[in-house]
Amino acid sequence: MSDVIATNQTILVVGGGISGVTAAIEAAECGKQVILVEKNPSLGGRVSQLYKYFPKLCYPSCGMEINLRRIKANRNLRVLTMTEVGNVSGESGNYSVTLKTTPRYVNENCTACGECGQAVEAEFDSEYDYGMKKRKGAYLPFNMAYPQRYVLDPRMIGTDDAEKARGACKYDAIDLDMQESETTITVGAIVWATGWQPFDADKIQ
């Protein structure tokens, strides 16, 4: 996080769902420096979990693929996953924002080969599948996840499974010593796009 450079000309977008991603891309393509933060390990938000979405009844993968290509091609846009806003102070045009990043335990050497996931035995409820399926303790959130980098569940750290994951990685991508980090940046504007909660279908009689 120490290499995050921002000025009062920078736009901070909070939330990596379709609204936040769209806002960040559009601003970056207009020439603005943009930092996009998302609390989860990957971008996409609720839309990435849907089968189809209204009104075109398209599969989310279509629009996501286009937007992810735009993100990768734009040097004005910096993406920080597993990051939340801790504090905001200041005024329009000059905000001071504290960002807190939780450890992924996987660094940028990761190629998403999946060897770590095959090596571990621990399983947990899949957040992406609303708890209806299980996922491994070392996992890629979903096939089109951006960044394409595995995550180690923090409940696995300190166990034999964590060491199995590290031993299985040929790229030295597993870093079990990662710690939570905090940094303070200065930005000129903030877009708050933290998403929505789906209706609890259990309430339907």
Regions flagged by a language model, labelled:
Residues 14, 37, 186-195:
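Short hydrophobic core segments
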Residues 19, 41-42, 197:
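Conserved Rossmann-like nucleotide-cofactor binding loop
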Residues 194-205:
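Flavin (primarily FAD) binding-site architecture
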Residues 28-42, 90-92, 96, 111-152, ...:
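Iron-sulfur cluster-binding cysteine motifs and their immediate structural context
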Residues 7-9, 105-107, 181-189:
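Core beta-strand elements of the Rossmann-like FAD/NAD(P) dinucleotide-binding domain
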Residues 48-85, 127-147, 205:
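N-terminal glycine-rich dinucleotide-binding loop that anchors FAD/FMN and/or NAD(P) in oxidoreductases
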Residues 3-19:
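Beta1/beta-strand and adjacent pyrophosphate-binding region of the FAD-binding site
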